[in-house]
Amino acid sequence: MYKEYSDLKDKRILVVGLGKTGVSLAHFLTKHGAQVTVTDHKSKPELSVQLEQLGELPIKFELGGHSPKTFIAQDLVILSPGVPSNLKIFDYARSQGIKITGEFEFSAGFIKEPIIGLTGTNGKTTVAKITEAILTESGVKTWVGGANEKPLVDYLRLDDKAQVVIAEVSSFMLEHCDTFNPGNIVFTNLAENHLDRYRSMEEYVNAKRRIFKNTNQATTSILNADDNAVVELARDPAVQRGRIFYFSRKPALEPQIMNIGGAVNIGDEIRVRTGPEIESFNIKGMKMRGKHSVENIMAAILASREHGATREAVQKVINTFTGLPHRIEYVRKVGGVMFYNDSKATNVHAVLRALDTFDENVILIAGGKDTNLNYEPLRTSVKRKVKTLILVGEAKERINRDLGDFSETFLIGTFEEAVLIAYQKSRIGDVVLLSPGCSSFDMFDSFEERGDYFKEIVRKFH
């Protein structure tokens, strides 16, 4: 793979997918002398905004479909995120000796600065943002991108580079990773997800496992000791090649973790060891709710300490970081009822974490696009915590089959109606929680749009 910008001169490169990433790639590649072709299954009118962003760049276009002859005339094919990697035309191109890669893998190869690679089913963006906050407070210049809609190629286009790059890495990105080798790997947790894309949980895990493919003695892996699937992954010889720091909320693991290095939560304290000394941080003033938030903070402390984070910066961020929108986000209190927006909860594991946050009676709004997930693991929490279950969207029947017997349940036609009924069913002291356990694409363009609509409805209540 190319490592220097000069390697791109006169190379014939095909960019598949003309979304935000495709546009950025086209700008970067043409600037460095590549002969660029862009292909997309959408038509010219559908891509008018993107085509305008490319202006007069010397690019060839193949729009409205993909032809084999375009693929086999290239030195390299780069797929934008979201383009399925299993299309038959890609198999054909590979059979003709054409190299196919993803934007993330391609862009990462040019980055000379240290990279923190963050993966896991949930928590990636929050850990990235806490890590960024700690390092920024410590005077370390960072750049955050990857799976959070800011492609790595955007970093390559910057003149003013960071000291540390924090990259969120999804399973889709890892499918194409052959050479990606971050100095630090953070693995937050591992649970069933994306089963509309993967044929089995094993296939999903194998995609995630690829982040460890190129580890060496200089790699530090930061792993969740409380997640059995992550601990199982840690037995992989590739992980064992480098140093491992574990983080845990189990005080019983404290002697073991302090011996090898890592972080442990005991009461209102996080104990951390990344060098000879053991440090303690107080979490009494922590603003975020939920036990999982403590896990996220521990992961971020360990990652940032590898890059010069100061003790003072860590404590300040613990005391001031308020969390991110759409992640157990407090909206408002109406008539003694608290409303929380957890629209980012697009899988079962995320809903479990949300329910675990509350001691109050919960009216849970769930449902969305059906991605073949199994909701049975929620039964105990629903039985214990959920007073009323409001189901909406494409997956409502599936969720009802798995959970409907464990709580008063309503299957609702529209999202707005679901929120209204949740409010009607609530009483003083209750929590109304939007934590869908599904992606948003049956009714909305994104989890952000879904969460914003929820907040808009709730703000009209009086």
UniProtKB/Swiss-Prot annotation:
Kindly list the positions annotated as binding ATP. 120-126
- The EC class name is ligase
The subcellular localization recorded is: Cytoplasm
Pfam family of this protein, just one?
Answer: Pyr_redox
One of the record's GO cellular component terms: cytoplasm
Instruction: Cite the entry's keywords alphabetically.
Output: ATP-binding, Cell cycle, Cell division, Cell shape, Cell wall biogenesis/degradation, Cytoplasm, Ligase, Nucleotide-binding, Peptidoglycan synthesis
* Coiled-coil spans in chain: none
State which Enzyme Commission number(s) the record gives.
6.3.2.9
Question: Which branch of life, at top level?
Answer: Bacteria
Instruction: State the Gene Ontology BP annotations.
Output: cell division; cell wall organization; peptidoglycan biosynthetic process; regulation of cell shape
- InterPro entries per record: DHPH_N, Mur-like_cat_sf, Mur_ligase_C, Mur_ligase_C_dom_sf, Mur_ligase_cen, MurD
Reaction(s) catalysed by this chain's protein: UDP-N-acetyl-alpha-D-muramoyl-L-alanine + D-glutamate + ATP = UDP-N-acetyl-alpha-D-muramoyl-L-alanyl-D-glutamate + ADP + phosphate + H(+)
Q: Which biological pathway?
A: Cell wall biogenesis; peptidoglycan biosynthesis
Q: Name one GO molecular function term.
A: ATP binding
Q: What is its main location?
A: cytoplasm
The UniProt similarity line reads:
Belongs to the MurCDEF family.
PANTHER family under this entry?
Answer: UDP-N-ACETYLMURAMOYLALANINE--D-GLUTAMATE LIGASE
Function according to Swiss-Prot or TrEMBL: Cell wall formation. Catalyzes the addition of glutamate to the nucleotide precursor UDP-N-acetylmuramoyl-L-alanine (UMA).
Write down what this protein is called: UDP-N-acetylmuramoylalanine--D-glutamate ligase
